[in-house]
């Protein structure tokens, strides 16, 4: 078994079942729709049909990035198991999530000095981001090391 985990954001544009099958945990962005905040949990809290029906009826969604505290809560269980983390974020050009991830990384590196956390700015979104995650999972599944996957 690899001593690292590859993680991403829910904005990766891949289905929940695919991410679970490929063992790619994801941290949820959040959005507000009709005054109610939802986690972007890939259709668990609200189905895509309901989501798009609300938009068709005039609702306007707003989104919020993952903050550093959410990253800490998301990553800490992996670190407690002794796993290094390779996390790929949504492009820093359209979200502050990369900066939040870097703040969490610095905090957790002090708490877990013997483990590695690498944060990669995908510089992409949607399908391009998803393809990158699929490629990284392929490398990991072929037995590539943490450092090789990061490179």
Stretch-by-stretch model annotation:
Residues 5-70:
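N-terminal glycine-rich anion-binding loop in soluble enzyme alpha/beta folds
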Residues 25, 84, 145:
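Residue-level detector of anion-binding/catalytic polar loops
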Residues 2-3, 21-22, 113-116:
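A short helix-to-beta-strand connector/capping loop
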């Amino acid at each position: 078994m690899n001593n690292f985990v590859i993680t991403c954001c829910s904005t990766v544009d891949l289905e929940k079942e695919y991410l679970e099958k490929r063992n790619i945990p994801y941290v949820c962005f959040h959005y507000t729709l009709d005054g109610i905040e939802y986690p972007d949990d890939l259709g668990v809290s609200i189905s895509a049909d309901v989501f798009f029906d609300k938009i068709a009826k005039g609702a306007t969604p707003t989104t919020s990035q993952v903050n550093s505290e959410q990253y800490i809560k998301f990553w800490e269980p992996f670190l407690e198991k002794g796993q290094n983390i390779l996390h790929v974020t949504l492009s820093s050009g359209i979200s502050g999530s990369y900066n939040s991830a870097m703040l969490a990384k610095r905090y957790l590196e002090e708490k877990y000095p013997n483990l590695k956390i690498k944060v990669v700015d995908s510089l992409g979104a949607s399908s391009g981001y998803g393809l990158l995650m699929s490629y990284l999972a392929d490398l990991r599944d072929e037995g590539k090391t943490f450092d090789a996957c990061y490179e």
